[in-house]
């Protein structure tokens, strides 16, 4: 069982909120469902992040969203008035690029990557010197015809050594069909950005990257190597990059099977589940073999600010 020991503590008053803040030096935040929902910042997001900075806490942002590059994320943070440096951000697209460089040892300038996903993946690959195909290429938007597809008429690109698959909001048969051709080659590695089956936005729940990657896995009869949360390669990279003490770190997220699992299996000192995204209080308290329980949970992140400042 992966469940964390002890009944999760709900942060409901100033004393518990202060105890929580005092326990940790570094906070790792998921973004979607925690800091914002789509293009809307959640209440008191800016205030709680500023409070943590004033307290001398280290802030790191760890998202399974591969559609944006780290640079694009700094701009999104800036649109909410939040100053975040690129090196503070780890996306699943960036983690996938690091994986093919450091683990698969693919060579920039020689090995190409076929991307099923959006621009964030291709941008991170480009920064590391890799040429990518597919992805946001507008020619993939056209209806599929095997006899006319520019990606098939002259045969597959023989230099493609890897497929990286992530969330693609333009998913269509053309993208699925060409990606499958590369996955049918045993010499081509299969990398998935993240396992999230869904994501919340504007009061709805939408299909996530995992639902699309698993479609490719089913049709190709292959299993991808996932790089985003809860994969520990991603956490190990973060711990190493910032020389962190795991016992003084807390993972803050809105999903039990990715964010909380990421923190618990990574041996972090704490986990905080926020209920502003995908999970419910009932699931947070339930003991399950499929996901761990958090150490703390709260209705929304901004409540820590209002509790500690008596503004409820």
From Swiss-Prot:
Activity enhanced by Mg(2+) ion but inhibited by Ca(2+), Zn(2+) and Be(2+) ions. Inorganic phosphate and ATP are competitive inhibitors, whereas pyrophosphate and AMP have no effect. It catalyses: 4-nitrophenyl phosphate + H2O = 4-nitrophenol + phosphate + H(+). GO terms for biological process: carbohydrate metabolic process. This is 4-nitrophenylphosphatase. Gene3D superfamilies: HAD superfamily/HAD-like (3.40.50.1000). InterPro entries: HAD-like_sf, HAD-SF_hydro_IIA, HAD_sf, PGP_euk. GO terms for molecular function: alkaline phosphatase activity; phosphatase activity; phosphoglycolate phosphatase activity; phosphoprotein phosphatase activity. PHO13 is dispensable for vegetative growth and sporulation. The gene is PHO13. Homodimer. Pfam families: Hydrolase_6, Hydrolase_like. It comes from Saccharomyces cerevisiae (strain ATCC 204508 / S288c) (Baker's yeast). Keywords: Hydrolase, Magnesium. It comes from the Eukaryota. GO terms for cellular component: cytoplasm; nucleus. The lineage of its organism: Eukaryota, Fungi, Dikarya, Ascomycota, Saccharomycotina. CDD domains: HAD_Pase_UmpH-like (cd07510). It is an enzyme of class 3 (hydrolase). The keyword Endoplasmic reticulum does not apply. Its EC number is 3.1.3.41. Present with 2980 molecules/cell in log phase SD medium. SUPFAM superfamilies: HAD-like (SSF56784).
């Amino acid at each position: 069982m992966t469940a964390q020991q002890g009944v999760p503590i709900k942060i409901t008053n100033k004393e518990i909120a202060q105890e929580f803040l005092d326990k940790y030096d570094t906070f790792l935040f998921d973004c979607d469902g925690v800091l914002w929902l789509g293009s809307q910042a959640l209440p008191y997001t800016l205030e709680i992040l500023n409070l943590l900075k004033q307290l001398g806490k280290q802030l790191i942002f760890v998202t399974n969203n591969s559609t944006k590059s780290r640079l694009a994320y700094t701009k999104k943070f800036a649109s909410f008035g939040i100053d975040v440096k690129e090196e503070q951000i780890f996306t699943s697209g960036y983690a996938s690029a690091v994986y093919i460089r450091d683990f698969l040892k693919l060579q920039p300038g020689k090995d190409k990557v076929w991307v099923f996903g959006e621009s964030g993946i291709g941008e991170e690959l480009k920064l590391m010197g890799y040429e990518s195909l597919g992805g946001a290429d507008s020619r993939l938007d056209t209806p599929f015809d095997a006899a006319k597809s520019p990606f098939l008429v002259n045969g597959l690109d023989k230099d493609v050594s890897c497929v990286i698959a992530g969330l693609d909001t333009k998913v269509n048969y053309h993208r699925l069909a060409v990606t499958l051709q590369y996955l049918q080659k045993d010499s081509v590695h299969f990398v998935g950005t993240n396992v999230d089956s869904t994501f919340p936005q504007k009061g709805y729940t939408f299909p996530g990257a995992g639902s699309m990657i698993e479609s490719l896995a089913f049709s190709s009869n292959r299993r991808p190597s996932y790089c985003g949360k809860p994969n520990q390669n991603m956490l190990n990279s973060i711990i190493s990059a910032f020389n962190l003490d795991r016992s003084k770190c807390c993972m803050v997220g809105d999903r039990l099977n990715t964010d909380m699992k990421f923190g618990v299996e990574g041996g972090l000192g704490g986990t905080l589940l926020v209920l502003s995204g995908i999970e419910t209080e009932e699931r947070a308290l339930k003991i399950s073999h499929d996901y761990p329980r958090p150490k703390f949970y709260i209705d929304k992140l901004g409540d820590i600010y209002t509790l500690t400042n008596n503004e409820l």
